[in-house]
Amino acid sequence: MGSRTTISILVVLLLGLVQLAISGHDYKQALSKSILFFEAQRSGHLPPNQRVSWRSHSGLYDGKSSGVDLVGGYYDAGDNVKFGLPMAFTVTTMCWSIIEYGGQLESNGELGHAIDAVKWGTDYFIKAHPEPNVLYGEVGDGKSDHYCWQRPEEMTTDRRAYKIDRNNPGSDLAGETAAAMAAASIVFRRSDPSYSAELLRHAHQLFEFADKYRGKYDSSITVAQKYYRSVSGYNDELLWAAAWLYQATNDKYYLDYLGKNGDSMGGTGWSMTEFGWDVKYAGVQTLVAKVLMQGKGGEHTAVFERYQQKAEQFMCSLLGKSTKNIKKTPGGLIFRQSWNNMQFVTSASFLATVYSDYLSYSKRDLLCSQGNISPSQLLEFSKSQVDYILGDNPRATSYMVGYGENYPRQVHHRGSSIVSFNVDQKFVTCRGGYATWFSRKGSDPNVLTGALVGGPDAYDNFADQRDNYEQTEPATYNNAPLLGVLARLISGSTGFDQLLPGVSPTPSPVIIKPAPVPQRKPTKPPAASSPSPITISQKMTNSWKNEGKVYYRYSTILTNRSTKTLKILKISITKLYGPIWGVTKTGNSFSFPSWMQSLPSGKSMEFVYIHSASPADVLVSNYSLE
C-alpha cells in the first residue's frame, strides 16, 4: 500500500500540475465519431440514411400494449431499455452544444448530423406526451432486460410502458423533458419554424404539469429506482426547465420564476461538484450567470448574482482554486465515482467551456478563493480533459471507441458485442447470448464507433473486459456534452484564440535522431552511408514548476520510413529520470506498446515521458523489417 501511495503522489506531482500543451489530436474526427454513436443507439424504424449499417429496426411494438405509439427514441447505454430521464438530459445537452457552437458544427460538416440526433429524440418525446398531463417515461425495465443478452432487433424482454400523470407525478422527468423541448425549439427555430413551435407548445405544457403536480418520478415509475434514481429531487429540474424556457421565449414569467424560487429551490444555495442527468444545479447556475452577464437580470439581479457565485465556485473547484475542489485521478481526470465516471468529465468540461466564453464576452476573469482564473485557463482545463479522453493519459488509452489505435475492444454493449442481425439472423436466445457472446474474450464484432465508455478508476487503471460494466459501458449522456467541447476546440470561429499559451521551454525543444544501424541483422541493414529507415523525433511539449523544481513533458515520435512493416523493435533509453508511457519495458530495453505488434510503412508511434532534465537519450538498438 505504501509503494502505491508513493507512486500516486509522484504521478500527481508530475502529471496533475501539467499545463495544457498544443495537442496533436484530431478533434474533427473525434467530433464526427461522437455524433455517429447516437445512430448506434437508435430504437425504432431506422431511416434510409442510417450510417451505422450493423444496426437494424427494433422496438417496433413499443407502447402498443398501452395503446400509444412509443416507437423510436434512444437506448440509454449498453442495454435495450428506453429511460426517459437520461434520454431527455441527453437531448438538452446536445441542444445546448448546438446553440452555443452551431457555427463550428456547420463549418465542419456535422451540424446536420447533430440536428438529426436531436430530432430522433424530440420526435419520440412528442409521442411520449400524448396529453398535457401525461408523459411516458420508460419502455422496458432494467431487471428483465439485464437478465438477457440479446440484440435489440430481436429482444424478447418485457416492453411494458410506464407513465407519469397528475395522480402519479414526476416533476423531475417532466421538467427535464420540458427543458429538452424548449432547448430543441431554439435549434429548429430557423430551419423548421412549425416544428419549433410544436416543441415549444409541449415544453410549456410539460413545465406546467411538472410544477403543478409535484413529486419524484421514481416514486411513480418505481422500476427506474435501481437504475436512474432521482436522488436530487425535482427542484433542480423545475429551475432548469424555467431557465431553458426563458432562453427559448424571453418570457419574463420564467425569469421571475428563477428569481422568486432561486433561494427556496436551492438554485442559489447549492454549491455543486457535479453536473449530470440527476443533478442540474450547476447547469442552471451557469445559464442564469449568462443571463446576468447579458445585462438581463433586472429586478432579480441580486438573486441572480447568488446563482452566479455558485456557478463560479463550481468552475473554481474544477481548477483546484476553491475551498472544496473536485477530485482528480493522478493523471488529471475528474473523478466522481467508479461507475461511468466519464459522464461527469464531459458535462463539467462543457460547462467550463461555455463559461470561458461567457467570461471572455464580459471581459472578466474568474475570481476564486485560491487565486484568479482567466477564460483561457478555463478552456485549457476543458481541453486537458478531452485530451485525456482521446489518449493523453498514463495508459495512452483512448476512451472513445474507434478513435486512435488503443481503444476499448470489449465494450459492455449488447448490440456491438453480438454479430450483426444484418449478417446473421440466427436467433440469439435470452440466456444464450450470455453464453455465446457476452463471455467471449475477443473483440466486438461490431465497432461501436464514437462511444465514450465509463473510463478509468481513481488511479487511472482500466480493464477492457465486457463484464467490467463500470468502466466499459457507454452512455448517450457521456457523448452529448462532448459535442460542444469538441466543436469549440476545432476552430476559433467564435473569435476567441484557440492557440492556447504554453510555457517556453528551457532545454532544446526538438531533437531528431536517426536510429543507428542495428548490431544484429534480422534483416539486411542499410549501407553505412544511408540514413536509417527508423527515425526518432523528440519534442518538449510542456513544462511547469512545482516546489521550485521545473518538470518537462517530452513527446517522442518513432517513424517507420521504410517500404516494409516494422516487426521487431528494441529501444534503448538512458538518462531517463521519470515515468514513461506508450511503450512496453522488456528487460533493459523498450518495445511496442501492449496494443501494437508492428508498425506499417510510413506510420508513426508516440510515447511520452516526464522528468526534470534535458531530453533522455533515445536510440533504436535493434529492429526487423518484413
From Swiss-Prot:
Keyword match Cell inner membrane: no
Pfam family, one: Glyco_hydro_9
EC number in record: 3.2.1.4
Catalytic reactions of this protein: Endohydrolysis of (1->4)-beta-D-glucosidic linkages in cellulose, lichenin and cereal beta-D-glucans
UniProt region (Disordered), positions on chain: 515-536
Gene3D superfamilies reported for this sequence: 1.50.10.10
Glycan attachment sites: N560, N622
Broadest EC class assigned to this enzyme: hydrolase
Bias-annotated ranges (Low complexity): 526-536
GO BP terms: cell wall organization; cellulose catabolic process
One GO MF term attached to the UniProt entry: cellulase activity
Span of the signal peptide: 1-23
PROSITE patterns referenced in this protein's UniProt entry, alphabetically: GH9_1, GH9_2, GH9_3
SUPFAM superfamilies: Six-hairpin glycosidases (SSF48208)
Keyword terms of this UniProt record: Carbohydrate metabolism, Cell wall biogenesis/degradation, Cellulose degradation, Glycoprotein, Glycosidase, Hydrolase, Polysaccharide degradation, Secreted, Signal
Record-annotated active site: D79, H412, D464, E473
GO CC list: extracellular region
Compartment(s) where it occurs, according to its Swiss-Prot or TrEMBL record: Secreted
Family: Belongs to the glycosyl hydrolase 9 (cellulase E) family.
Protein name: Endoglucanase 19
